[in-house]
Amino acid sequence: SCLSSGALCGIDSNCCNGCNVPRNQCY
């Protein structure tokens, strides 16, 4: 799952676009 906030959100490997966008919802 994506981190919704905090220093790590931009490097969360499960996310894209920084925060709040799950990898499987990337375009």
UniProtKB/Swiss-Prot annotation:
GO terms for molecular function: toxin activity. One of its GO terms (cellular component) is extracellular region. Keywords: Amidation, Disulfide bond, Knottin, Secreted, Toxin. It is found in: Secreted. It comes from the Eukaryota. Expressed by the venom duct. Disulfide bonds join C2-C16, C9-C19, C15-C26. The modification Tyrosine amide is found at Y27. The keyword Disulfide bond applies. Negative results: does not show effect on Nav1.1, Nav1.2, Nav1.3, Nav1.4, Nav1.5, Nav1.6, Nav1.7. Does not show effect on Kv1.1, Kv1.3, Kv1.4, Kv1.5, Kv1.6 and Kv3.1. 1 uM of this toxin does not show any effect on voltage-gated sodium and potassium channels. Does not show antibacterial activity on both Gram-negative and Gram-positive bacteria. The presence of a 'disulfide through disulfide knot' structurally defines this protein as a knottin. The cysteine framework is VI/VII (C-C-CC-C-C). This is Conotoxin Lo6/7b. It comes from Conasprella longurionis (Cone snail).
